[in-house]
């Protein structure tokens, strides 16, 4: 009887990965990158690294097939959010309890990364034993997904992914295949006013009051946008605001950082017009203020492609493994595959992984072991299907 801690399966890899701190910001990805590099098979596997930021790397492992493009690609990020507080479990402990593994990244997305590693290693073993691949198989482990997603941008720039490739991330999707994304546009909006004593406010121009007008107008404009049949409604969050100096001083400066999640047909250019109009109305309402803005993030929406070859194959594999009709939905956040789809126009990008996104980024984050087992089986089956594995 093999002890599971000695069996190099996705459950084992999940625990090993969770025990390595790869928080962003914090310890970052180097330890986990080095660990993955150390466990990957060397025979028949081409391993590449690429520096994304100082001492922060992407890692790619490739088993070459007769056809290099399209390749089947698993892309998984190595970083997690910060460990945080209010845990009742050790965030780096990988404790197994009642069919769950606890720890930072257990759900998002070290269990998904573990499933991809396990599937890749199994295909590598089968190739070593004499199987041949028609299409190449790649495992890309990316940096910085939890921040500005510079890892996947570097992978695109390095040519590690192509428009024609079949690409899947293993983000937590709660048993669903998620194939579409709302766009994500970020703005930094600033209102400049005129300072004055609070006893004579008419001598100044209240930047905070003007920003309140901007926020109100943007919120109402976003609420008026039509919903999308798959992606739902567009939303806006005013995540951070800074303004004023003291309660008794008319504020001469206010800045707000805005996160918009946009559904078709609204894009960043259209959102920019909403911001411009909001600033204009604030300037007309509060005399003496002047507003300006900059776009700090621009990720386009990604719509479902009913004709996607990867989608059909992934659904068939998932249905066969689970014995159920796997649901197809959209991913509420933005992922590495969404960046690839939006940048390259790749219509074969999607998410499927263990865990529930609602558990991510929280204390006592966990993933169900049965979820890991399911996903591992699906990924192995998908890898064999998409690479067109053949006997010698």
Residue ranges, per PLM feature:
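Acidic/His- and Gly-rich active-site-bordering loop/insert found
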Residues: 1-106, 125-133
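Metal-dependent amide/peptide-bond hydrolase catalytic core
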Residues: 5, 48-51, 82, 172-173, ...
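Short beta-strand segments
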Residues: 75-77, 140-142, 168-171, 190-192, ...
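Short coil/turn connectors at secondary-structure junctions
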Residues: 67-72, 98, 132-137, 161-165, ...
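Alpha-helical metal-binding/catalytic segments enriched in His/Glu/Asp
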Residues: 74, 95-146, 187-191, 202-222, ...
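Acidic/histidine-rich catalytic neighborhood of metal-dependent amide-processing enzymes
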Residues: 109-182, 387, 391-392
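Short helix-capping segments at alpha-helix termini
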Residues: 43, 127-133, 160-161, 281-288, ...
């Amino acid at each position: 009887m093999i002890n599971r801690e000695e069996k190099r399966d996705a459950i084992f890899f999940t625990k090993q990965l969770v025990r390595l701190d790869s928080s962003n910001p914090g310890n970052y990805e180097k330890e986990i990158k080095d660990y993955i590099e150390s466990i990957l098979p060397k025979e028949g596997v081409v391993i590449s690294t690429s520096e994304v930021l100082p001492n922060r790397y992407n890692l790619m492992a490739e088993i070459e097939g007769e056809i290099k493009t399209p390749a089947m690609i698993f892309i998984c990020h190595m970083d997690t959010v910060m460990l945080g507080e209010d845990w009742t479990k050790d965030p780096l402990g990988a404790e197994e309890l009642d069919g769950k593994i606890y720890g930072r990244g257990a759900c998002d997305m070290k269990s998904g990364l573990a499933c991809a590693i396990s599937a890749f290693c199994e295909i590598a073993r089968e190739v070593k034993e004499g199987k041949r691949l028609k299409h190449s198989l790649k495992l890309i482990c990316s940096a910085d997904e939890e921040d500005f997603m510079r890892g996947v941008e570097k992978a695109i720039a390095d040519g590690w992914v192509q428009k024609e490739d079949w690409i899947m991330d293993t983000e937590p999707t709660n048993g669903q295949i998620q194939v579409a994304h709302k766009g994500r546009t970020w703005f930094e909006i600033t209102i400049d006013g005129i300072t004055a004593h609070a006893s004579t406010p008419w001598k100044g121009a209240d930047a905070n009051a003007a920003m309140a007008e901007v926020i109100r107008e943007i919120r109402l404009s976003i609420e008026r946008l039509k919903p999308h049949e798959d992606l739902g409604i567009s939303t806006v969050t005013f995540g951070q605001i800074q303004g004023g100096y003291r309660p008794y001083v008319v504020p001469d400066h206010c800045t707000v950082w805005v996160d918009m999640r946009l559904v078709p047909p609204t894009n960043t250019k259209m959102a920019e017009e909403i911001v411009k109009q909001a600033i204009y109305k604030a300037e007309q309402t509060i005399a003496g203020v002047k507003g300006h803005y900059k776009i700090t993030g621009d990720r386009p929406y990604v719509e479902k492609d009913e004709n996607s070859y990867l989608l059909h194959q992934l659904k068939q594999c998932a249905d066969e493994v689970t014995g159920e009709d796997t649901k197809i939905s959209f991913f509420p956040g933005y992922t590495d595959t969404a960046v690839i789809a939006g940048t390259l126009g790749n219509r074969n990008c999607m998410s499927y992984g263990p865990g529930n996104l609602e558990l991510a980024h929280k204390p006592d984050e966990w993933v169900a072991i049965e979820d890991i087992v399911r996903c591992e089986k699906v990924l192995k089956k998908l890898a064999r299907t998409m690479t067109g594995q053949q006997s010698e």
